[in-house]
Amino acid sequence: MVHPLAGQPVKKEDLIQVDTIVKDFFRIIPNHEVIEERVSFGTSGHRGIASKGTFNELHVAAIVQTICDVRQEFGATGPCYIGQDTHALSQPALQVAIEVLLGNRVKARVDAHREFVPTPSVSRAILRHNAEAAVDNVADGIIITPSHNPPEHGGIKYNPPHGGPADTAVTKRIEALANEYLEKGLDSIHRFSFHHLVGAHESAHCGCCHHEEEQVVAPAAISLEEAGQYLEAYDFKMAYVKELPQIINMEAIQQANPKVLINALGGSGGAYWHAIAKEYNLNFTIINSDYDPTFSFMSYDHDGAIRMDCSSPYAMAEVTKKLGDHILAIGNDPDYDRHGIVTEEGLLAPNQYLVVAAKYLNETRPWKGKGVGKTAVVTGLMDAYCNASNHPVYEVPVGFKYFAPLLFDGRIGLGAEESAGASFLQQDGTVWTTDKDGIILGLLAVEMLATTGKTPAEQYVDITSQWGTPVFQRVDMPCTAEIKSALKGMKPSDVSMTELGGSPILDVRTTSLFEEQPIDGVKIVTDTGWFVARPSGTENLYKMYAESYLGEEGLARLMEDGKCTIEGLVTITD
């Protein structure tokens, strides 16, 4: 059920108290004996809330210390590129991360302009560096972000030398060792206090960090002079902006110069959009680009939460209203790994835009015919188009980490997630980023408009006229731990029925089509659609996804039958 405030402007009384949240980050010590307070990597890093003891100073210190301990196992021998988004907790977490890197004599490359650094910019920096790096100077990266989560949340993720999200083997190793540090406490961490360095090395520090006067930091066996040598300034922004013609037809955009509204959504890439508009002299109107960790300009999401989800029509409601005479609007989440595309018809669903992007890229890039990577919950239209145009589909579990090696070695031209995350290859067929990039997906929509004269929404209509018009829904369902456990351990044989939503079942899978990796749930395919259920990694709920070619009524039947199937699992497994 949609919350009555969904789509309405956020009220002042619902905004976070930044000072309180930051104090909780340093003040609260997580209890390693409480499962919820231990380090736990989901599909993209460790996330939590300071007041609940799930994202605090010790979590960040323990994770970064572990990264320093084991990064050479993953091939990282050189600098660590570090970025952060605009969540309130990202600033103190960045401070802690830098201090631990310095204490371990790992070169920390931070933004030269004291600006925020988006996820795709970190990924691009790692790949740019490693393209010419010697064996003893291979880079990796750390990104401080809880993505589109509400303002009180914090998060941290690790990108190894391939530039994308760490795979499960890497995160499990980090998780296990970090929890050992969590048990030992801050005294076990090698760390150089940022206070000593700010005055001596002002030119390179991030400028965004919070400083606690009474903060206790275990001394590191490193001098002030030596620590200064391990903190390096790097111009993330302009390196990224100047390389855009390698992946986007910026000349076509310049020539057409359509009027585009950019909703920076208070995120880490606001300065990037300004730099792009200036560098290429584009007709962009940029809003919500100021730093506001309360995200006071937002509208409530579907459940009444403040969530910076650029793919949500409720969170993007105010932007849709402001489209005016702009042909297109683009939105991004706080760390800029997601995209939202708005036309006069409204906000395009990610599944709609991603199939449009796949078709357009295949028709315009020299590397056309490359495979398309999609998660198990991306629209079946993608399969229909790819099968008709004779290029392979790589269907993987949910999580962009599964696309990183496929993009890195060029097996796929596009990697696409239903949650509005994607990246694609450069014009010459080489890798751009191995993490999601919301900026290039936004610019691609502008390029489409410039070269075809059609908006992505109009191009989607062209696609559905050939392969049908599916309807899609995703719902988060509260559940017991028993249902989550049963769902994660589900086998295809647990589904005994022959129909779902009134249509014959063609296939039941608990592994992906590509490499048969566990999807931590189940996918049921019928002759008129599909249903997926998978448990949340951090909350007592499971996610239901369904797509039907039988309209809204068919979708409702599919969802209801799927829900009954999942909730019957506990009885089946007892």
Question: Where in the sequence are the language-model features?
Answer:
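Flexible hinge/switch segments at interdomain interfaces of large molecular machines
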Residues: 33-43, 193, 216-219, 286-293, ...
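Ferredoxin-reductase
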Residues: 2-12, 75-164, 383-384
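Internal gly/pro-rich beta-alpha loop/helix module
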Residues: 130-202, 209, 216
